[in-house]
Amino acid sequence: MKTVLLLICLLGSAFTTPTDPLNYQFGAHGQKTAEKHKYTHSEMPEEENTGFVNKGDVLSGHRTIKAEVPVLDTQKDEPWASRRQGQGDGEHQTKNSLRSINFLTLHSNPGLASDNQESNSGSSREQHSSEHHQPRRHRKHGNMAGQWALRGESPVDALGLVRERNTWKYNKNTVGLDENNNGSEEEEAGEEEDEEWGEETDYRDMKHRARGTSHGREYRRWQNENSRPSGEFLRDSSLPVRITKRHGEKFSMEEESQEKLYKEGKLPLSKKNHNEDQGEKRQSEESKEHFQVVNQRKHRAVTKRQDKEGSNAEEDDNDSGDDGEEDLGNVWREAVYEEEERMQSNDQDSITNKQKEEITAGDDSGVYREMQDYKGDKIKDVTHSEDNHYHHEPPNSSSKQQLQTSSSVESMNSTEHEDEVKTTGGSYHEESARNSTGKALPDLCRNFHCKRGKVCQADKQGKPSCICQDPAACPSTKDYKRVCGTDNKTYDGTCQLFGTKCQLEGTKMGRQLHLDYMGACKHIPHCTDYEVNQFPLRMRDWLKNILMQYYERDQDTSAFLTEKQRNKVKKIYLNEKRLVSGEHPVELLLHDFEKNYHMYLYPVHWQFYQLDQHPVDRSLTHSELAPLRASLVPMEHCITRFFQECDGDQDKLITLKEWCHCFAIKEEDINENLLF
């Protein structure tokens, strides 16, 4: 019986020896908990020996050996071979369950295969090591069991073994793994073994910390490679871990070999990190190069504007001057268009200043958008002002004629700037195509503006400059866009007219050539003294009728007159004594003016206010009068002489007082408060 009992104790101790590999738990910071590695005593509660796996976590690196309970009194008569067979079956079942768990782990996380292999090798090494230290314990257990058997005590009671069950739970993918941990021994035997293994436990704790740090680095690298959040890896068990010095040396050698691989860059993870670092460096270099290119563009744009200002100043100087031998009409026309060109030059300077400010504040694309918006606003203002000038009913004409003339004049003046933009853009695209084979010249003429009749072109050095527009290269126009020059020649459009003027620059003919009026050239009879005296009567009636038509249209759209203007015009419109528009004899017009004098006060002031825009100084230059004159010349051949005679002091400026005197407004009725 003693021999049988001794064999049972030896076999039970062999199968209850813990052979787990290193147990680690990586939390949020990849650190292990030291409490999980303490040796389990018989007094320790059952709750501390139970490990749980959280939802979505991956269990790896665990090996559990099913413990065998010592034979009870009822099992003493069983044959030893049957018990051995039962133990073998239990071990076989345990191995099969572990293989299924390892397969699930490797299938869910292929990247952890290396960790599992390392854990498997560690488990086998630890099992051999633990068997190496078992004979001494077995002899002690056998001696004590023999003494207690002589006293008649049960081996189970004598050894005080407690059956413990640990269960790991997989949430959603439940895998039940029952472990029978034989973790209770006598207090005396536990104390002796603690003293015996004290040195190894200290060494084990030290290696745990080193291995924890190494595995923490490997985990962080694996997490960066996958670039997605991964679950925490719990490598925890309630079973104690025993590492001998020989195992510690093997672990150290493995760590050194892994560190060498990472340092040499042989692992794919390190290669990927290296490529990512190179990509970030390239992106930073590209951003720096883009910033330098933007700064260079800004510097070139500022230089272009300075060069343009100098060229515009020279061109204005060349265009100035009058010929002393010219007659009074030609002198007036030349002064009108010199003033008009000077105004356009001032507008270009203001645009240039605005562009410089925008360049300082933002990039080139933002400057271009702001410049285009500004030009669009200028065109709208000029068009609206010209609408007020050209939508007038020509004296002694019907409403149908007035609408046709107004639409023709409006389209002609609204496309005047469009012709300039088109020709400039065409030259720019041709130049860009011309330089496509050589060095690229980006945005050289985009923000470089030339006055009418000239286009931008870059020279061999890449510097933009203004050259004369080729009249033959101007786009084709429709008949209503034709204009008549002061040389009594019809041009297809303003592009052709000012291109011809630019080619004749520096000559007497070039200085005299200007836009005379809209439409094809026709015979303009000479204005007699009688006709020029009747002209103010027709002009006053025309201004009054224009305001009435604007008021009628504003009742639906409110696009022509302001609220203050509508209130003023409403009183005239509702007056029953008002003379309706139409062709009336001169006598009737004079009678209505004397009878309803107050109805003509505001229309005369209103027309002066509409013309006095560049600048608003209570006086009209010939440039400010030119749009109105050019639109009315075909119908009123006396308008040029009328404006000349209104300038009593011949200073090329028509003040508000001179304007009102031309329309027979009394001096006491001249009121600047009506200029709205």
From Swiss-Prot:
Organism expressing this protein natively: Coturnix japonica
Subcellular location(s) per record: Secreted, Extracellular space, Extracellular matrix
Purpose: Could play a role in the late stage of neuroretina morphogenesis.
Biased segments, Acidic residues type: 184-202, 312-328
Signal peptide: 1-16
Binding annotation for Ca(2+): D647, D649, D651, E658
Keyword entries, A-Z: Calcium, Disulfide bond, Extracellular matrix, Glycoprotein, Metal-binding, Secreted, Signal
Gene: SPARCL1
Comp. bias intervals (Polar residues): 95-108
Residue ranges, compositional bias (Basic and acidic residues): 35-44, 249-266, 273-291, 385-394, 415-433
Ranges for domain Kazal-like: 462-523
Official protein name in the record: SPARC-like protein 1
Domain (Follistatin-like) ranges: 444-466
UniProt lineage: Eukaryota, Metazoa, Chordata, Craniata, Vertebrata
InterPro entries per UniProt: EF-hand-dom_pair, EF_Hand_1_Ca_BS, EF_hand_dom, Fol_N, Follistatin/Osteonectin_EGF, Kazal_dom, Kazal_dom_sf, Osteonectin_CS
Cystine connections: C445-C456, C450-C466, C468-C502, C474-C495, C484-C521, C527-C638, C646-C662
Top-level taxon: Eukaryota
Xref: SUPFAM superfamilies: EF-hand, EGF/Laminin, Kazal-type serine protease inhibitors
